[in-house]
Each structure stands twice: as C-alpha cells, then as structure tokens.
C-alpha cells in the first residue's frame, strides 16, 4: 500500500487490511515513515510505502485484496482569512484539514494447482532444491546420529512441513528440529529451511535411510 500526495501531508495513519483467504507475511519497513519525492505521469509526488505484504492464496478462483482507509492532516490556506489581518494580529492564514484517503481494492484470478496431486503433497509451492546428509555415517549401537535435510529456494516456505523420513524399524527416532533461515523481501520468501532428525540405532548392521 503506497500513498501519493501533491500536498503537505502529515500525521498519516492507516488500518490493517483484512487479507482473508491469504497466508500473509509482512515485509518489515522503517517505523519512522517520511515522504519521498517521486515522479508519476509527469508530476512530482510525495510518496510513502505504508505497508507491504507477500501473499500466498490459499484457494483458487477470484480473490479480492481489500481497500483500506488512511487518515492524514493537510495544511492549506484558509481563503476566508485576510492575509493582512492575520499578519498584524499575529495569526496565520494556514489551517490544518483532516483528509481521508482510500486505497482501491484489487481483484486477482488464482489458478488451481495441477492435478492429480501427489499423495504426499503438503502444500509447498515454489522453486526448491533439497539435499541430505548423515552425521556421522558410521555409529555404534545406541549412539545417536543426525540426518539433516536442507530445503533451499523460494516460495511459501513458511508453510512447508517437515518431510516424512522412513527410518529402519529398530531405530529410535525423535521429532525433527526445524531451523528457519528464510527472509521476506519484495521478491517473496527465500532462503533455507533445515530439518534435523535425531535417531538412535538399537542393533548393529548396515541400514539404508
């Protein structure tokens, strides 16, 4: 949500949009907001990005990004006050006027996911690479080992669940420890998500995970 203004706008305040039907992640912006000059259609505007989100639709079909209202103060000249009277009386011809700005709503069409979906599909959509490592690769009976699965790329990584790993039956296993190394930016969500599985083999032998 970006505000454009041709006048001296101050004390800007805006609400939070109701982004129903989307998984949202807000891009962190400076708390202290100030207008920056920008040319648009041949005119110079004071602009400020109020809020910015990365959106992941949770259903297909037509969806609406709602409008929100902003309130601000505009300083403008009061034509009912004589400038000469104001000068000699120590007053001002300028007055503060409260203004309401409405950001228009947007509509988008969300295509369904390809079908048939894999039976183990968990909802992760994007471009991902996956790698795995076992540390150590040789252990003694009843010693712990760690299987690390690293998923890197970009997409809705916050919604990504831990992969299901089929350990040998006589391995004692524990829930995955999840390390989130993703960042939210203008291009979306990207980075790494690391899943560490601790397992303890109870019998000697050679096993495949």
Give residue spans per PLM region.
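Regulatory and interaction patches adjacent to catalytic/ligand-binding sites
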Residues: 2-208
């Amino acid at each position: 949500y970006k505000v454009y203004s041709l006048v001296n706008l101050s004390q800007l305040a805006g609400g939070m949009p109701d982004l129903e039907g989307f998984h949202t992640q807000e891009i962190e912006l400076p708390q202290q907001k100030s207008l920056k000059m920008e040319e648009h259609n041949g005119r110079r505007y004071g602009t400020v990005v109020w809020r910015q989100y990365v959106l992941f639709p949770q259903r297909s079909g037509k969806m609406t990004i709602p409008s929100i209202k902003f309130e601000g103060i505009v300083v403008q000249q009061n034509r009912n006050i004589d400038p000469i009277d104001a000068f000699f009386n120590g007053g001002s011809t300028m007055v503060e006027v409260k203004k309401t700005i409405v950001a228009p709503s947007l509509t988008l069409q969300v295509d369904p996911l390809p079908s048939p979906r894999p039976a183990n599909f968990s909802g992760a959509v994007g471009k991902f690479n996956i790698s795995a490592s076992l540390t150590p690769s040789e252990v003694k009976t009843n010693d712990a080992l760690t299987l690390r699965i690293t998923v890197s790329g970009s997409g809705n990584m916050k919604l990504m669940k831990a992969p299901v790993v089929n350990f040998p039956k006589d391995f004692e296993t524990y829930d995955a420890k999840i390390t989130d190394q993703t960042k939210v930016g203008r291009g979306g969500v990207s980075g790494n998500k690391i899943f560490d599985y601790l397992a303890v083999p109870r019998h000697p032998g050679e096993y495949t995970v």
